[in-house]
Amino acid sequence: IARSISLQLGIPAYIYDGVTVDELLPINKLTGLPSMRRKGMGHNLNTRAAALRYARESGRDYKDITVIVAHLGGGISVNLHHNGKIEDFISDEEGPFSPERAGGLPMFDVIKECFSGRYDYKGMMKLVKNQGGLMAHLGTTDSRAVEQMIQSGDAHAKLVYDAMILNIAKNIAKCAPNVCGKVDAILLTGGIAYSQYVTSEIEKRVSCLAPVVVYPGEDEMRSLALGGLRVLRGQETAKIFHKSESANG
């Protein structure tokens, strides 16, 4: 898409903080199986925009801050920004469950479910990506509807919602050991960050690590524009990627 627009208008096109941007430190990519590696794929655009905003508002350069950013939306991810890079990333496939995603699950139970005969590959992917989390427990992906259930006295809804919030807090804390706990701030962004119930409960659990700052919502088009502007102004350098021989076939 970027190339076609570039050719039509005769101008350069930049792809900024795509989902597949991966800046994880080598130590954070390792797992218990050499054939499987952790990836820094997820809400990079929105989380870096939040980190850049915090740097700007605190009068510091992005490369000089250390922040943990939690993106709270249909999927929930948490990452660590340090030395101007996203050095650790907990994706929505391994972290807390969310309105739609199942999040991290007990491995042996997942293996059993895969071989139960109830799901093929596509069915299993749909289950964990679109039918998990709040949808699986409460039949809705709308956090506002869940909060209305809680206000109406639904104890089960409160248990599920509070479990999601607790797991968000746990995953925020998991990023801190990367920098020996020396974190400047914890940033909460995404659509669910509009919820005072959610943000106040998270703050109560993680403010012992660092101050919590809330930047609700997503402003991805503006973030893309500002990213391109920083390159044009020379504040950032565009990276050139070449297709490897293996990618050609």
What are the language-model segments listed below?
Residues 3-4, 15, 35-64, 74, ...:
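Glycine-rich phosphate-binding loop plus the immediately following alpha-helix
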Residues 1-19:
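Conserved phosphate-binding loops in N-terminal lobes of ATP-dependent enzymes
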Residues 54, 58, 176, 229-236:
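Short, hydrophobic alpha-helical segments
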Residues 12-18, 68-70, 80, 88-89, ...:
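General beta-strand structural signal in soluble alpha/beta enzymes
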Residues 183-203:
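Glycine-rich phosphate-binding loops at beta-strand->alpha-helix junctions
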Residues 126-181:
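Adenine-nucleotide phosphate-binding core of ATP-dependent small-molecule kinases
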